Amino acid sequence: MFYDQAKIYVKGGDGGAGAVAFRREKYVPEGGPSGGDGGRGGKVIFIADEGLRTLVDFRYKRHYKADRGEHGQGKNMHGKSGEDMSVRIPVGTVVKDADTGEILADLIEHGQKVVVANGGRGGRGNARFMSNTNKAPTVAENGEPGEERNLLLELKLLADVGLVGFPNVGKSTIISRISAAKPKIADYHFTTLVPNLGVVELEDGESFVVADIPGLIEGAHTGAGLGHEFLRHTERTRLIFHVLDIAGSEERDPLEDFQIIAEELRQYSQELANRPILIVANKMDIPGAEENLQRLTEKLGEDYRIFPVSAATGEGLKELVYAAAKALPEIPAPQIFVRDEEQHKLTQASAPHRFELTREGDFFVVSGKEIEKHVQMTMFDREDGLYRFQNILKAMGIERALLDEGIKVGDKVRIAGIEFEWEE
């Protein structure tokens, strides 16, 4: 079975906690703090693999977590970083944030890598907090939680040419004729329910990949007849063969069919509608085809190249194939999006100090990515940790915001699930 979508969860490893320790050696009085830093958490990395063809593996395993960093120790010993988790996915997979819809990566080359969840940094040990005014700090940090997100994987076929058209117009027969593909062929609608890929090899050694896209119907852009699934496969193609039953063998008007499918492509994506199109007038061996071909040429001949063919006899297919081979080098590939680690770090580093203050019953609730990270990394069981957290509230403007909202001694504050009581 062909799977082209999967929803998974990924999480980078948490950073290890920093240590609180002091150097205690003979003949070294007042040795000072020696707590080492925690190790960085591992990353989750996707690697494109041309040997994979489907997303079926992600149906059975949906959670991917990298290793956490080890905790720091005394004698300034830093924790070991967590191991990265490498996950192989098929070439052609588009990776999206399932919650925001943001495209994180479009992996189109074998070996291409993208970091989809960064590991958290290790917490600092108390040796990092020594200053002229505090020679023996007893504060350290917990490790930063690893980045986590829900991902939507979409496998878009890496085909140069996509065959589109109503069901039963002969697309499967055409692809079986021009390539080595062996699709299921029968005289009923929706015979093709998954895309068929075939490689077309020319006599001069050139080749290109064609995809027999399952049959579209009117309303496909709204999802009718599995329309969204079918149209999704067309987006990656550079050239479209619009296949028509020119004989009208099922009592359909080929010109009307062309207009309906063209409108479905436009409704789904204007970029897709602007893709170069060759019209394939199939079933020329059936009576009535010549008359319809003349009518089609009169209406569309100035705007499109029309190729009369017969998939049953092979007539006209060679001319069609060579026309496609000539056109493809001049057609640019669809736009590619890649989110790499450095870009991601830059975005994170430039994020402003933002928070939101709301009321929930008796609680003042403070939310925001940065302050929640500080809560998770603070060791509240240590007095120095509490003191440092208070300074963070002041530096970020949260203390002033709470006072402006009328907070009083004894009122309750909640941040990242931790509850505090306000004091002077």
Curated annotation (Swiss-Prot):
Residues 347-424 form the OCT domain. Signal peptide: none annotated. Its cofactor is Mg(2+). Keywords: Cytoplasm, GTP-binding, Hydrolase, Magnesium, Metal-binding, Nucleotide-binding. The keyword RNA-binding does not apply. GO terms for biological process: ribosome biogenesis. Transmembrane segments: none annotated. GTP binds at residues 165-172, 190-194, 212-215, 282-285, 310-312. It is found in: Cytoplasm. GO terms for cellular component: cytoplasm. Mg(2+) binds at residues 172, 192. Its EC number is 3.6.5.-. Pfam families: DUF1967, GTP1_OBG, MMR_HSR1. Residues 159-329 form the OBG-type G domain. Residues 1-158 form the Obg domain. GO terms for molecular function: GTP binding; GTPase activity; magnesium ion binding. Coiled coil: none annotated. Belongs to the TRAFAC class OBG-HflX-like GTPase superfamily. OBG GTPase family. PANTHER family: DEVELOPMENTALLY REGULATED GTP-BINDING PROTEIN-RELATED, MITOCHONDRIAL RIBOSOME-ASSOCIATED GTPASE 2. Monomer. This is GTPase Obg. It comes from Desulfitobacterium hafniense (strain Y51). The lineage of its organism: Bacteria, Bacillati, Bacillota, Clostridia, Eubacteriales.
